[in-house]
């Protein structure tokens, strides 16, 4: 059990106290320009630091989260805070903490740590909730604020909407202005998270393995090396210093080329690439091939099934999962359920069905046997252990598994939030998509969606051959560019 610290706060109490009669229109920071589209996307609030995510906005977010959480959570404890390495992180952390403490909450700031660390510490500390300041795999100029409930899972859409109603001045619930909280630095709690990753595994189980880690200049730069060395692995680290200017830039889980080269050059057994907040991971085999979340789910599913730890051989994944994975799993007597893109949808379906394994092709993997949320470090440790115990290489496991259908994914940047949100009202684009679906029929799939984390429209085409996938991807991307982007004079 994590206990309240006995030492004094690291800085003084707030020097102001809100009037008990204050309203949203009289709050001193209530002058932030808000978009017409919802603030909360599939992974919290994200945007460019200094534009959408300013200090006044973070203050409001913190204050209204501090009003909402106590009304729906019985835990009397603190809110757990963490952040990645982005340059805007400290600014947002201080403003967010000011809002939370102004609302009467106590803040425990873990400092630099992976997102799953915040979720874990929240779940074991009787916390009222958690909050992570990160934009995950997004570029350095972006940032984000993501809340967790007291159980360490992502905050429900209902509570996110209540927080947003306060920010927008439409809240219809009572507010507390009579107390203020304290702020504590608690970086030592990160060690408890690291211990939780080791506890289900045999000490030294990775001895004899050489593993390359690409840490993306992000949240796992300190945690990941300690965790893997603690299991006996020999590790080579890439992009392993905190660097807010370079987080995710040409590295990590969205840019695998450096890791692929390093695995081959060092004759390593395998490699792992994390994103900026380390809640997802992709692997590289000894031949330099990328191993995505579909393969990770397949291998882990086989292992859990053999141990009788996978009820009904059910795996929950998203609409992005490759048909080759689904067909191979079905042939083994398994079952695949698909959800919308977003690990919160995967988690909800897992809860509904009692599934013990789920995840996304992008590398978010959830296994309730070992963790409460998607965790890149947990996934990497278990995959490495699985490979070691198999007696063969990851490359051999891949060769014995399944062939993927060619799948192309293109991201088209659309800055206009309204156009992104309402793309389905664009008749020429919808017509092009329908033509593609008719042409592909049973030979492939089309998926077009607005990203919930980046200002892009994602176009995915999967087909029985690469030429077919390329042709329809190009047609749909062209339609997006012609009809959703502003015309040039």
UniProtKB/Swiss-Prot annotation:
What Gene3D superfamilies does the record point to? Alpha-D-Glucose-1,6-Bisphosphate, subunit A, domain 3, Alpha-D-phosphohexomutase, C-terminal domain
Described purpose of this protein according to its UniProt entry: Catalyzes the conversion of glucosamine-6-phosphate to glucosamine-1-phosphate.
List the HAMAP family hit by this protein, alphabetically: GlmM_B (MF_01554_B)
- What Pfam family is a match, any one? PGM_PMM_III
* Name the record gives this protein: Phosphoglucosamine mutase
Which catalysed reactions does the entry list for this protein? Answer: alpha-D-glucosamine 1-phosphate = D-glucosamine 6-phosphate
List, in alphabetical order, the GO biological process terms annotated in this UniProt record.
carbohydrate metabolic process; peptidoglycan biosynthetic process; UDP-N-acetylglucosamine biosynthetic process
Q: What is its EC number?
A: 5.4.2.10
Q: Which residues form the active site?
A: 136
The protein's UniProt keywords, in alphabetical order, are: Isomerase, Magnesium, Metal-binding, Phosphoprotein
Q: Name one GO molecular function term.
A: phosphoglucosamine mutase activity
Organism (species): Trichodesmium erythraeum (strain IMS101)
């Amino acid at each position: 059990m994590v206990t309240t610290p006995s030492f004094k706060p690291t800085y003084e109490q707030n020097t102001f106290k809100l009037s008990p009669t204050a309203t949203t229109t009289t709050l001193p920071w209530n002058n932030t320009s808000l978009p017409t589209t919802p603030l909360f996307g599939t992974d919290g609030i994200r945007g460019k630091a200094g534009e959408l995510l300013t200090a006044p906005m973070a203050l409001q977010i913190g204050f209204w989260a501090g009003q909402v959480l106590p009304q729906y959570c019985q835990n009397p404890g603190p809110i757990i805070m963490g952040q990645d390495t982005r340059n805007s992180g400290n600014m947002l952390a201080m403003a967010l903490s000011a809002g939370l403490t102004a609302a009467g909450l106590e803040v425990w700031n873990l400092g630099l740590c992976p997102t799953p660390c915040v979720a874990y510490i929240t779940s074991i500390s009787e916390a009222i909730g958690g909050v992570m300041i990160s934009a995950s795999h997004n570029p350095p100029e972006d940032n984000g604020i993501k809340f967790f409930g007291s159980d360490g899972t992502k905050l429900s859409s209902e509570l996110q909407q209540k927080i947003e109603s306060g920010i927008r001045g439409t809240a219809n619930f009572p507010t507390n202005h009579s107390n203020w909280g304290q702020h504590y630095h608690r970086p030592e709690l990160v060690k408890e998270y690291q211990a939780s990753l080791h506890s289900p595994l045999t000490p030294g189980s990775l001895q004899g393995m050489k593993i390359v880690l690409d840490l993306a200049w992000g949240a796992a730069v300190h945690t990941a090396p300690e965790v893997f060395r603690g299991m006996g692995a020999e590790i080579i680290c890439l992009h392993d210093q905190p660097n807010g200017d370079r987080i995710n830039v040409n590295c990590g889980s969205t840019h695998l080329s450096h890791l692929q080269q390093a695995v081959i050059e060092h004759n390593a057994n395998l490699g792992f690439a994390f994103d900026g907040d380390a809640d997802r991971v992709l692997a590289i085999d000894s031949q330099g091939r990328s191993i995505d979340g579909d393969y990770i789910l397949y291998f882990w599913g086989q292992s859990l099934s053999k141990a009788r730890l996978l009820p009904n051989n059910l795996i929950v994944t998203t609409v992005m999962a490759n048909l080759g994975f689904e067909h191979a799993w079905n042939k083994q007597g398994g079952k695949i359920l698909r959800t919308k893109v977003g690990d919160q949808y995967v988690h909800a379906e897992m809860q509904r069905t009692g599934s013990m394994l789920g995840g996304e092709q992008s590398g978010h993997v959830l296994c309730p046997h070992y963790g409460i949320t998607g965790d890149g470090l947990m996934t990497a440790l278990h995959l490495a252990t699985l490979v070691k115990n198999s007696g063969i290489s990851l490359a051999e496991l891949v060769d014995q598994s399944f062939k993927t259908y060619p799948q192309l994914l293109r991201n088209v940047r659309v800055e206009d939030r309204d156009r992104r949100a309402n793309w389905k009202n664009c008749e020429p684009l919808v017509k092009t998509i329908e033509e593609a679906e008719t042409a592909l029929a049973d030979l492939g799939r089309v998926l077009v969606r607005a990203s919930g984390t980046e200002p892009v429209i994602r176009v995915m085409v999967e087909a029985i051959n690469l030429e077919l996938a390329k042709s329809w991807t190009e047609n749909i991307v062209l339609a997006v560019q012609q009809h959703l982007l502003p015309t040039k004079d």
